[in-house]
């Protein structure tokens, strides 16, 4: 693998991990264009570590507050159900922490179910193209979502389970994780900013779990030089940081649908190229 390919993959991962256009779908497509049979596992891990670092940087304060809230909820547990319910209803940081845990449960089950067939899924540009069309449709539909939604105290555990399920299904190449989860929250009536914040905080356990699985699989795999791995991770982190901040601004404006035509164009191009 050449240095330029590593930089390009870092840029693709950084942009598409956060912009609602599917990082997995684009990596499948670009790897096909570069003639790589399979992604090099350790490089893929470093690319995801880079984007994880971007999320941790942007949301560090919220992560810290959510952790404190979770411990307050745990401290209330010995006092009985009434005390736990009070924390759930009045402590927004504790509520966010619990919503993340609840949403992670279906994501984990779906991820484990797909883990054994992930290689086959990621080898299919046709599947990525078709799923990009679906991603585009979801993004376009956000044009019709009301401008003011429910704030965090009104977000329910059922909402969290739904968004977590959607996040699990986003393992399919071409389905944007950020796009599908933000869209799901918006369709459930959640406020734009809360939807975006919850989507990215919910991504952290999923990314960490996926990295753990990949590290276990990568122990005996060949890998590029360490310098290339570091380069890919750094490029991914800085590109991801810029993309994440841009997307948050776009979500606040209610302009997620801007990305729909791009998803349709790329998805249709892939399908035509594979069937014509």
Swiss-Prot record:
Catalytic function, reaction form: di-trans,octa-cis-undecaprenyl diphosphate + H2O = di-trans,octa-cis-undecaprenyl phosphate + phosphate + H(+)
GO biological process: cell wall organization; peptidoglycan biosynthetic process; regulation of cell shape; response to antibiotic
EC main group: hydrolase
GO cellular component, one term: plasma membrane
EC nos: 3.6.1.27
Listed GO MF terms: undecaprenyl-diphosphatase activity
Transmembrane segments: 1-21, 41-61, 97-117, 121-141, 155-175, 200-220, 231-251, 256-276
UniProt keyword annotation of Cell membrane present: yes
Membrane topology annotation: Multi-pass membrane protein
Matches recorded under InterPro entries: UppP
Subcellular location: Cell inner membrane
UniProt record similarity statement: Belongs to the UppP family.
Function: Catalyzes the dephosphorylation of undecaprenyl diphosphate (UPP). Confers resistance to bacitracin.
Name recorded for this polypeptide: Undecaprenyl-diphosphatase
Organism, scientific name: Desulfatibacillum aliphaticivorans
């Amino acid at each position: 693998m050449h240095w330029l390919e590593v930089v390009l993959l870092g840029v693709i991962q950084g942009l598409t991990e956060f912009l609602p256009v599917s990082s997995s779908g684009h990596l499948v497509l670009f790897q096909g264009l570069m003639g790589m049979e399979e992604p090099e596992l350790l490089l893929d891990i470093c690319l995801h570590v880079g984007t994880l670092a971007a999320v941790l940087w942007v949301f560090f304060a919220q992560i810290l507050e959510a952790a404190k809230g979770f411990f307050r909820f745990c401290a209330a547990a010995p006092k009985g159900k009434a005390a736990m319910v009070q924390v759930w209803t009045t402590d927004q940081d504790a509520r966010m922490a619990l919503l993340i845990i609840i949403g992670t449960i279906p994501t984990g089950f779906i991820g484990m179910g797909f883990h054994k067939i992930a290689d086959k899924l990621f080898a299919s540009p046709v599947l990525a193209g078709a799923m990009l069309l679906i991603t585009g449709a979801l993004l376009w539909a956000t044009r019709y979502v009301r401008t003011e939604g429910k704030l965090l105290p009104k977000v329910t555990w059922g909402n969290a389970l739904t968004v977590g399920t959607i996040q699990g299904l986003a393992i399919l190449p071409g389905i944007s994780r950020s796009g599908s989860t933000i869209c799901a929250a918006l369709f459930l009536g959640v406020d734009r900013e809360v939807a975006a914040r919850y989507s990215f905080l919910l991504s952290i356990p999923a990314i960490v779990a996926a990295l753990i699985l990949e590290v276990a699989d990568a122990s005996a795999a060949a890998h590029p030089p360490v310098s290339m791995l570091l380069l890919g991770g750094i490029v991914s982190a800085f590109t991801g940081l810029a993309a994440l901040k841009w997307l948050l601004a776009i979500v606040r404006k209610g302009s997620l649908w801007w990305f729909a035509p791009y998803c349709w164009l790329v998805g249709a191009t892939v399908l035509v190229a594979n069937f014509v």
